[in-house]
């Protein structure tokens, strides 16, 4: 949360992922982290956290970028237009979180993209391997470090970027 280089990387990742027509959900386990990242995108982003009024949540759900806590996304986030999630902080149980972008809706071709930020410290390595197992079981095309890069600028289908 307080790592400047990591936050700079996250800001650049959000810029890159939001350049097209995708609607992003950026998840962190810290409110402060969500608020900090939100300040970098004041016009195009909203917050989705516990303690907010329903009207505020509704307004945020219309934004191109939504910064949310894992706990709020786990409990009551239902935004059918979401198609991209960025996991901004380490977590092992991500099934509910990635499920938010996996829903099929009428008139929308579902090609979910997940950006999983892998923190290399040993305490987070076990979480990373649990997430990778979930992605493989879900049939994701995996792109990133030590993995073949996508052939096109905008990969098709369910994609995971490391």
What do these predicted regions represent?
Residues 145-162:
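Acidic, low-complexity intrinsically disordered tails
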Residues 86-87, 143-145:
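Short hydrophobic alpha-helical runs that function as membrane-insertion/retention elements
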Residues 1-29, 35-39:
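Conserved interdomain hinge at the start of the Helicase C-terminal
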